[in-house]
């Protein structure tokens, strides 16, 4: 598929044919794709969305607040639950202050971000656990 989409322009329509050896092979997928199937895709490129740097699923567009944890912790109890975290990240994306990786499940990205911050796995993030990616890199250098 990658080869078939190379150098495609916005508004362009293209038929991509994938032979069995580049698709599902002789075996196919039981009950879904017959063996030795030739895959044919009619594609129209409607929009080209820039991705994120390698290794990132979320980026900030601009400066990050120095009081980020406090902003996420809406109820001020010193702990951020997944619901608070998710609402905050989605609000940042909606306002253009943040960007999630296009083409991926947004809820899954946010859940993974939260899980990465919840270092002790107790279902909540404290200020001590909370670190941005660049802060983690500095700590690793020590």
From Swiss-Prot:
<keyword id="KW-0106">Calcium</keyword>
<feature type="domain" description="EF-hand 1">
    <location>
        <begin position="60"/>
        <end position="95"/>
    </location>
</feature>
<feature type="domain" description="EF-hand 2">
    <location>
        <begin position="105"/>
        <end position="140"/>
    </location>
</feature>
<feature type="binding site">
    <location>
        <position position="122"/>
    </location>
    <ligand>
        <name>Ca(2+)</name>
    </ligand>
</feature>
<keyword id="KW-0479">Metal-binding</keyword>
<protein>
    <recommendedName>
        <fullName>Putative FK506-binding protein 9-like protein</fullName>
    </recommendedName>
</protein>
<feature type="binding site">
    <location>
        <position position="129"/>
    </location>
    <ligand>
        <name>Ca(2+)</name>
    </ligand>
</feature>
<feature type="domain" description="PPIase FKBP-type">
    <location>
        <begin position="1"/>
        <end position="49"/>
    </location>
</feature>
<keyword id="KW-0677">Repeat</keyword>
<dbReference type="Pfam" id="PF13202">
    <property type="entry name" value="EF-hand_5"/>
</dbReference>
<dbReference type="Pfam" id="PF00254">
    <property type="entry name" value="FKBP_C"/>
</dbReference>
<feature type="binding site">
    <location>
        <position position="120"/>
    </location>
    <ligand>
        <name>Ca(2+)</name>
    </ligand>
</feature>
<dbReference type="InterPro" id="IPR051989">
    <property type="entry name" value="FKBP-like_isomerase"/>
</dbReference>
<feature type="binding site">
    <location>
        <position position="118"/>
    </location>
    <ligand>
        <name>Ca(2+)</name>
    </ligand>
</feature>
<feature type="binding site">
    <location>
        <position position="124"/>
    </location>
    <ligand>
        <name>Ca(2+)</name>
    </ligand>
</feature>
<dbReference type="InterPro" id="IPR046357">
    <property type="entry name" value="PPIase_dom_sf"/>
</dbReference>
<dbReference type="GO" id="GO:0005509">
    <property type="term" value="F:calcium ion binding"/>
</dbReference>
<dbReference type="GO" id="GO:0005783">
    <property type="term" value="C:endoplasmic reticulum"/>
</dbReference>
<dbReference type="InterPro" id="IPR011992">
    <property type="entry name" value="EF-hand-dom_pair"/>
</dbReference>
<dbReference type="InterPro" id="IPR018247">
    <property type="entry name" value="EF_Hand_1_Ca_BS"/>
</dbReference>
<dbReference type="InterPro" id="IPR001179">
    <property type="entry name" value="PPIase_FKBP_dom"/>
</dbReference>
<dbReference type="GO" id="GO:0003755">
    <property type="term" value="F:peptidyl-prolyl cis-trans isomerase activity"/>
</dbReference>
<dbReference type="InterPro" id="IPR002048">
    <property type="entry name" value="EF_hand_dom"/>
</dbReference>
């Amino acid at each position: 598929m990658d080869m078939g989409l190379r150098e495609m322009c916005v508004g362009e329509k293209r038929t991509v044919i994938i032979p069995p050896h580049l698709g599902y092979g002789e075996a196919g997928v039981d009950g879904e794709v017959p063996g030795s199937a030739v895959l044919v895709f009619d594609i129209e490129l409607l929009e080209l969305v820039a991705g994120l740097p390698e290794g990132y699923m979320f980026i900030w567009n601009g400066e990050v607040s120095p009081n980020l944890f406090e902003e996420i912790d809406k109820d001020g109890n010193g702990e951020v639950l997944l619901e608070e975290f998710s609402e905050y990240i989605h609000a940042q994306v909606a306002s253009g202050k943040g960007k999630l990786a296009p083409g991926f499940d947004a809820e899954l990205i946010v859940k993974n971000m939260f899980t990465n911050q919840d270092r002790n796995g107790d279902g909540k993030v404290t200020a001590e656990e909370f670190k941005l990616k660049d802060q983690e890199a500095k700590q690793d250098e020590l």
